[in-house]
Amino acid sequence: MPIPVGNTKNDFAALQAKLDADAAEIEKWWSDSRWSKTKRNYSARDIAVRRGTFPPIEYPSSVMARKLFKVLEKHHNEGTVSKTFGALDPVQISQMAKYLDTIYISGWQCSSTASTSNEPGPDLADYPMDTVPNKVEHLFKAQLFHDRKQLEARSKAKSQEELDEMGAPIDYLTPIVADADAGHGGLTAVFKLTKMFIERGAAGIHMEDQTSTNKKCGHMAGRCVIPVQEHVNRLVTIRMCADIMHSDLIVVARTDSEAATLISSTIDTRDHYFIVGATNPNIEPFAEVLNDAIMSGASGQELADIEQKWCRDAGLKLFHEAVIDEIERSALSNKQELIKKFTSKVGPLTETSHREAKKLAKEILGHEIFFDWELPRVREGLYRYRGGTQCSIMRARAFAPYADLVWMESNYPDFQQAKEFAEGVKEKFPDQWLAYNLSPSFNWPKAMSVDEQHTFIQRLGDLGYIWQFITLAGLHTNALAVHNFSRDFAKDGMKAYAQNVQQREMDDGVDVLKHQKWSGAEYIDGLLKLAQGGVSATAAMGTGVTEDQFKENGVKK
């Protein structure tokens, strides 16, 4: 028998029976094809013992996660793309639902428009950690409301003909994928953040491999990544939290390593190939040189000049570059063969440790070369790092077993780079789902022709990028619309609103034209009447409501 909720009976056999039964249910859940590509570093019983005695709850977000999985699976099977953009508010999601099959919630947009501290700022993830989960709840509740409102309205049809007159229903329950930044702290913070997202309606979340303390927008300079395993631990924590909560949460692993210039630690051998070192043994540590200059009163520009000079004098290189340069300077006769011997064993995807690379270099050269990655460390204690597409491939391969989709943040909408990344990931994981940020930080008119813009999404889709999104389109379309209307209103008064807004709403059949109805006034009137025996003298949509003026404008009711 199951142990009662909040059980106080000290029965060992009953406890073991409950845990065995719960573990069996979890194993049955995990046997579904949904999890065929998912790796877990723990057992079903490990999850069972951490669930408590309360019966498992099916969170609405888990229903939406299963829906999202089916949406993405269909796109994968058909070679099509789920495309969406960052939504700001309930108005936007109610309109997006007519045409798009997913919704994105951007941390950047929340940082500038929806921080729970009400303090706007750039995308540094320094807002309270409940900011994006709160926006998810805001928009998810709006989705549920519009879904309820629509069903109640359609229930009034007395025949198939009347239902046909209403048109096809809108699927307002569009799965939401939200920005989890870099986790807002250590693994316990990642766990709590994931829990908030699940509780508040997110079908999926993405998390990047930047440090949480130095997190930057994916299109800012100075990005610092964490070691590969540290981000794997984050992804494992996300899935563990979802498993404990019996959630099918979709997990997107993002890497910012393509343009990363710093890394927090040298502990993971998979990162060693990309860590920058000094090759000049006579150079002083950079942090000491900079600190001395600061103490002597150097200005900002002087400090920048000092850093540039130090970097030139230090002979900064990756270790394999230093080895190749040393081979080419040597008197060895078969230089190209020796270089090939070294690079065949020390490459961006070989995961060779620095210790092993040094040993091989000594075997080839007959002596050790000077290379020190401690000397160039910056004042914050971070190591210099040179990422790139191959670095992103290495990391995406490491993240893939723990995530449903992988995503490389990039600085340009470069199709060839996207192709290189996709092929590099799929060489090891052929069925891996990919995501792509169609960022408004890119100068699209400068990057490609109009015809290329038109086909870009599907060309990426052909490479396996099944989920693509414009992170800040909600922000930019909002700004553009209000900019234009404010300008025209200042000049033309009510003509600007009547002709450029209201008339266009009529022409395009935008349901917000009847904003009282859109907001659910009729639905709420129905609730009031239901509560009061069928009548309400204070019904909002009764005689006298100004929205009656729109009855003859030809817009669908």
Swiss-Prot record:
Pathway assigned in UniProt: Carbohydrate metabolism; glyoxylate cycle; (S)-malate from isocitrate: step 1/2
Residues where Phosphothreonine is found: T53
Cell compartment(s), UniProt: Cytoplasm; Secreted, Extracellular space, Extracellular matrix; Vacuole
Gene3D superfamilies: 1.10.10.850, Phosphoenolpyruvate-binding domains
Impact when changing T53A: Abolishes short-term enzyme inactivation by glucose addition
GO BP terms, alphabetized: glyoxylate cycle; tricarboxylic acid cycle
Residues in the signal sequence: none
Catalytic activity as recorded in UniProt: D-threo-isocitrate = glyoxylate + succinate; (2S,3R)-3-hydroxybutane-1,2,3-tricarboxylate = pyruvate + succinate
Catalytic EC class: lyase
Primary location recorded for the protein, binned into one broad class: cytoplasm
pH dependence, entry free text: Optimum pH is 7.
Cofactor field: Mg(2+)
CC per GO annotation: cytoplasm; extracellular region; vacuole
InterPro entries named in the record: ICL/PEPM, Isocitrate_lyase, Isocitrate_lyase_ph_CS, Pyrv/PenolPyrv_kinase-like_dom, Pyrv_kinase-like_dom_sf
Keywords tagged on the record: Cytoplasm, Extracellular matrix, Glyoxylate bypass, Lyase, Magnesium, Metal-binding, Phosphoprotein, Secreted, Tricarboxylic acid cycle, Vacuole
Pfam families found in the cross-reference section: ICL (PF00463)
Function according to Swiss-Prot or TrEMBL: Catalyzes the formation of succinate and glyoxylate from isocitrate, a key step of the glyoxylate cycle, which operates as an anaplerotic route for replenishing the tricarboxylic acid cycle. Required for growth on ethanol or acetate, but dispensable when fermentable carbon sources are available. Also acts on 2-methylisocitrate.
Complexes and interactors: Homotetramer.
Family matches, as NCBIfam families: isocit_lyase
Name of this chain's protein: Isocitrate lyase
Species: Saccharomyces cerevisiae (strain ATCC 204508 / S288c) (Baker's yeast)
Taxon lineage: Eukaryota, Fungi, Dikarya, Ascomycota, Saccharomycotina
Gene designation per UniProt: ICL1
